[in-house]
Amino acid sequence: MDKQGDILMKFYDLHCDTISAIYELRKQGKQAELSKNSLHLDLEKLQRGGYGLQTFALFVDKGEAEDCCLEAKSMVQLFKEELKKNQDVISQVFTFGDIEENERRGKLSALLSLEEGSIFEKSPEDLKWFYDQGARIATFTWNHENSLGY
């Protein structure tokens, strides 16, 4: 920011666990929203901080989840619902052109990523499904061995 408080450069952050954290809180019966919450990141904080793009990782702990793919698909649904509720502020991006369009409109960009290959290790069709939902980044492993790596 300059002396007048104007943002000179937009930030593009390539990882946060906010959607996964909101998902877990809701599983515990607690209220949590993307717009404003007590987590590390919410839309209000992104706007104040001068963000242009936030990558939202869907994290599933293979050591705890019964079905990693199903769990991640539920998180995709949550991600889409939260974006719809806040569509005046943030939109999902699939291409660089989408990022440019959001910037022209004064909106934040949301990029979807997958953290843990066990989400899609069972079937190439699952990986295709997540791609169709907008996932553009994926990690093959986290802390557990899976069929993709160790």
Language model features with spans:
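N-terminal hydrophobic targeting/anchoring segments and the immediately downstream early-domain regions
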Residues: 4-150
